[in-house]
């Protein structure tokens, strides 16, 4: 049986904290060193000095009405450049994420419990092309207080398969030792806590980088959708039209009187002045919106659960998904 998440700790990255989202220790790997930065290939979010496999940053999320989007775009024009991975006059691409969790959904519940330190295990692709040369990213995203620390490993889609995480000894060698370390750490944590596929999340992302900043990102997410899964399969072109997905950016999902966009600001420790002015000018209110937690809440409602007393989520029974 996997160990309790209340009793496992981290010896790499942020300090160890006893809570529901704590990362398992690496005691079984004496002398192992924490992942270090390495070069990131162009596909996927990255820029300048932040082209690392380990990124530490701050994030702020906002739910905004669609009518604000053109106004914010206009404000941003002097400060940003389009994400080169985006297509069209408005730089957009599709992001698909496979979320891993324990049978009791502890990683999803860590958000509701407001755990000071928590983490997510996810496998991510960009676009809908199933070309075997396209990349798959294994991401460990940690949040300690307000700081986001993300490590990732890149593998070609043609080498990805259902045995990679359960049996990391079968994984191919990646382009750098640092990425190999990140992949092994991802698999170690997933297997220690018994995490397996639980949810697919897909959305269209409009993305920009700060034109003169070491690391600053602006994203607008729309058509945010999910579907439950128990499979390691990463969907591609066959579901590019969102036909088999359940919407999340609805009034119910966003808890707003309108269906809106998820607007996000990302920066290093020195937040650009133009970002702070944007928040002030448009009177934006920060929200702790988590796509995975919202998908979990909506799915429980879809299956007939009711809201728990004093909880923004729903009542839960083990292995519900």
Predicted feature descriptions by range:
Residues 1-321:
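Phosphate-end processing signature that detects enzymes handling 5′-triphosphorylated RNA
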């Amino acid at each position: 049986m996997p160990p309790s998440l209340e009793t496992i700790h981290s010896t790499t990255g942020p300090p160890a904290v006893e809570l529901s989202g704590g990362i398992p220790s690496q005691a079984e790997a004496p002398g192992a060193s924490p992942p270090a930065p390495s070069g990131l290939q162009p596909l996927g979010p990255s820029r300048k000095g932040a082209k690392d496999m380990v990124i530490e940053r701050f994030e702020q999320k906002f739910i905004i009405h669609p009518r604000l989007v053109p106004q914010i775009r206009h404000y941003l024009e002097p400060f940003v450049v389009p994400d080169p991975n985006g297509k069209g006059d408005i730089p957009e691409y599709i992001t698909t994420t496979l979320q891993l969790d324990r049978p009791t959904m502890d990683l999803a519940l860590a958000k509701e419990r407001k755990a000071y330190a928590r983490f997510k295990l996810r496998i991510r692709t960009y676009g809908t092309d199933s070309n075997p040369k396209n990349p798959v990213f294994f991401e460990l995203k940690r949040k300690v207080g307000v700081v986001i620390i993300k490590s990732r490993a890149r593998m070609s889609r043609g080498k990805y398969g259902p045995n990679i995480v359960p049996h990391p000894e079968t994984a191919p060698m990646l382009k750098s030792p640092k990425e190999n370390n990140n992949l092994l750490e991802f698999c170690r944590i997933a297997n220690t806590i018994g995490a397996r596929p639980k949810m697919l999340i897909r959305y269209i992302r409009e993305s920009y980088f700060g034109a003169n900043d070491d690391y600053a990102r602006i994203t607008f997410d729309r058509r945010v959708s999910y579907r439950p899964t128990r499979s390691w399969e990463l969907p591609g072109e066959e579901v590019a039209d969102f036909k088999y997905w359940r919407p999340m950016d609805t009034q119910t999902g966003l808890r707003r009187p309108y269906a809106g966009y998820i607007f996000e600001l990302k920066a290093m420790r020195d937040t650009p002045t133009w970002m702070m002015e944007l928040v002030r000018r448009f009177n934006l209110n920060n929200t702790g919106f988590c796509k995975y937690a919202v998908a979990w809440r909506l799915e429980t409602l879809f299956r007939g659960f009711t809201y728990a007393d004093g909880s923004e989520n729903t009542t839960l029974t083990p292995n519900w998904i």
